[in-house]
Structures are given as C-alpha cells and as structure tokens.
A protein has these predicted regions:
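Extreme N-terminal basic, low-complexity initiation segments
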Residues: 2-8
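Adenine nucleotide-associated cytosolic modules
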Residues: 12-214
Length: 214
C-alpha cells in the first residue's frame, strides 16, 4: 500500500536497491541478512591506505561496512601506482587519505568515510581508535604497529595485522575475544625491532592484493 505522498513506495525501492547491491553475499548462508546488518553497523579503522590498505578499503567498502576511517599522511607518488589500486595518475601529489575517501565514496555512497590525512601518533591515536570497533593495520613501520597494538589492548579492540615484503606476506588477528595474544607476543623486543635495517623496497603488485584481501 502506498500513501498519497509516495513515501512508503520510495522507502521500499531504497530497501530493494540495498538488497540487490549486497545480494551476492547475502545469499551465502554464512552471511545472510543478519551478517549484512552487522557489516552495515560496523566501524573499521584502516591505518595506512597504501599497498595493503588499498585492497582492504576497496573490499570493505564494496561489502557495505557502514563506517570506514582512513589514516595516512602520505601523498600519492608514481611508484605507488604499480600496486596501490585506489589511485590514478591524476592524483599524483595529492593526500592519499583524501583521494581514497573520494574513490570509496564513488564506489559506495551509502557508507560513511572519514579521512585522516595525518600520521597516527601517541597524540592522536587514542582518540581516533576509540571511535571504531576494529583496527586494520596497513602501515609499514614497527613504531605504528606497537602503538596500534597497545591502544587496542587498552580499549579491548581487535587488531588485524598485515605485512608484506617481496613475494611474502603475514596476516594475524590479535586481541580478539578471549584470545589475548598480541603483537608484542610475536615481537617482544620493540627496541630490537626498531634497530633492524629497513626491508627491501621490492614488492610484486599482486602480493599486497592477496594479503590485503585475506
């Protein structure tokens, strides 16, 4: 039944459109409508929207995660384009966080996206992280990983860790549910890790795509 204003009819059309957008995952018994609702209510912070962060952000936005935060203080460079699929040549020299937010909004206008064109530091990390349910690490340095880890422990939030080098990658989830293992259990000596020489810069473009998708 549609009232004279047509508002009920419009609401039904909007609801049907949302169901069609996510239909291919809603029909999976492991997801269903309840799972899709959880995705739409979720708030995920992605720290670093480069090689790892690009596929992470694209697929979370496509899946309908309701709120994404994007933290990155870097600018788009030509060397990024080989693997950082969020960006294009016309965005060279522009802030990654802002460009990523625009691209993701074009992909899915139904979700909230909050760009933070700044480095995650001890001064801002606590306030930023407390706005989200889960933190996904797409950064490339040990200091930021330890910072994310410690605040996630303090705020009792899951920390999804990822790293890549060459043809290899690592993925783990820390501080989830009753599982109390964290990043410091994997790498207990922070000072030793900070003294390590930087890893080789070489990486195949598909490596972050595979690791980020996991």
């Amino acid at each position: 039944v549609v009232n004279p204003s047509g508002k009920i009819g419009i609401s039904l059309l909007i609801l049907k459109d949302k169901q069609m957008r996510y239909d291919r995952q809603i029909i999976l018994p492991e997801v269903g409508e309840e799972g899709q609702k959880k995705l739409q209510e979720a708030k995920v912070l992605i720290v670093g929207v480069g090689g790892l962060g690009s596929p992470i952000a694209l697929y979370l936005a496509g899946a309908g995660v309701g709120c994404l935060g994007l933290v990155d203080d870097d600018l788009v460079s030509v060397t990024n384009l080989q693997r950082q699929v969020l960006y294009s040549e016309k965005e060279l020299g522009k802030p990654k966080a802002i460009c990523a937010a625009e691209r993701l909004s074009a992909l899915n206008s139904e979700i909230e996206i909050h760009p933070y064109a700044a480095r995650l530091t001890k001064d801002n990390a606590y306030d930023i992280i407390q706005e989200y349910d889960i933190v996904v690490d797409g950064c490339d340095n040990f200091a930021t990983r330890y910072l994310i880890n410690d605040i996630c422990i303090e705020q009792k939030k899951p920390y999804v860790y990822g790293a890549i080098c060459g043809f290899e990658g690592q993925v783990s989830v820390f501080n989830y549910g009753n599982q109390k293992k964290n990043y410091r259990d994997l790498y207990p000596d922070e000072e030793e890790m900070q003294r390590m020489p930087p890893p080789p810069k070489g990486v195949m473009g598909v490596t972050p795509a595979i690791v980020g998708s996991i």
